[in-house]
Amino acid sequence: MRIITINVNGIRAAERKGFFSWLKKQNADVVCLQEIKAQEDQLDERFYPSDMHTYYHSAERKGYSGTGLYCKSKPDRITYSPWQDINSEGRIVQADFGDLSVISIYLPSGSSKEERQALKMEFITERFMPHLRQ
C-alpha cells in the first residue's frame, strides 16, 4: 500500500500550482492532507479526484487548518476527530481499512505561544498516543 502525507498549505493554492497533476503521477492508495484551509462549499469538482474517495475535515474558521484524505478503496469507516472540543479546527480525519487505520492529523502549532505548546503536548500525550494504542 502506498500512503503519502503532505501539508498542502492551502488546497486551492496547491491546485493552482499543479498539485493534482502531480498527485495523478504518484499512484497512491491513500493521501493524507494537512492544512487544506478551505470549506467544502469552496471546493468544486477539481478538488475531488475521480478515481479516489474524498474526505475533508474543514475548520469552522475559514482559511484555517483542516485535513483531508483521498483513498483509492472505500474505507470501512471514517472518523472526524473523536474529540469534540477540538473538532472545530478540523485537525483529524481517520480512515479504517480492516485492521489498518490511516490518520491525517494537523497538530496545533507549538511555536506561537506557551499556551498552544502546552495544548499540543497535552493533545499528543493524553489523547493521540492512547488513541493510537487502541
Feature roles, as predicted:
Residues 15-16, 88, 128:
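Amphipathic coiled-coil/heptad-repeat helices and related helical stalk/stem segments
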Residues 117-134:
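A long, amphipathic alpha-helix that forms part
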Residues 20-23, 112, 117:
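Alpha-helix termini
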Residues 1-47, 64:
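N-terminal, active-site-proximal structural segment of metallo-dependent hydrolase catalytic domains
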Residues 6-13, 80-82, 119-122:
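Short, flexible loop segments at the rims of nucleotide/cofactor-binding pockets, characterized by
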Residues 36-37, 43-112:
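Structured beta-strand-rich core segments of catalytic domains in phosphoester-bond hydrolases
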